[in-house]
Amino acid sequence: MAILKVARMGHPVLRAKAQPVPPSEIRHPRIQQLIDDLFETMREYSGIGLAAPQVHEGLRLFVAGVRAADGNAIELTDDTDMPFIALVNPEVTPVSSEVISGWEGCLSIPDIRGLVPRADRIHVKAYDRQGRAVEIEAQGLPARVIQHETDHLDGVLFFDRMANFESLTFNDEYRRYWMDDEET
């Protein structure tokens, strides 16, 4: 496995629409290596999701996951943790009209975060890393991460989804001025 270079905001690959991966090619060693490298890169930079375009690969796939403190992956519906997943050619559909604003950051936009409105509950059709068709219902954090990473596949960055830029902030300022607001 290799740690890949992450494209930063301003690089054209982040604004391009990624190409679908033919299902017959998902198990190809090149795609499997890319998935492994995405996981390795995501962990190296302490991310919870990473899309192929973020590592200069214009393909419709991403990895995501959060490991529990005890090292075990948890159920996808848990609001604070999610298992490690690789999704290829995802199609996301909101399940309800409920939209919740939550804080997001991005490895391609280092040290900045903002409040982004997203559907709280979604349905996802995709292929897993073995090339099997899968359907997932996700809510809370997993739904937010899947929508964020799927946006990368369409050339959309998180601040494109922000209702306004009043909450766009550096991480240091977020910790200093915004974190206390979340806890009250």
Label each PLM-derived region with a short phrase.
Residues M1-Q147, H152-T184:
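Active-site rim/adjacent substrate-binding subdomains
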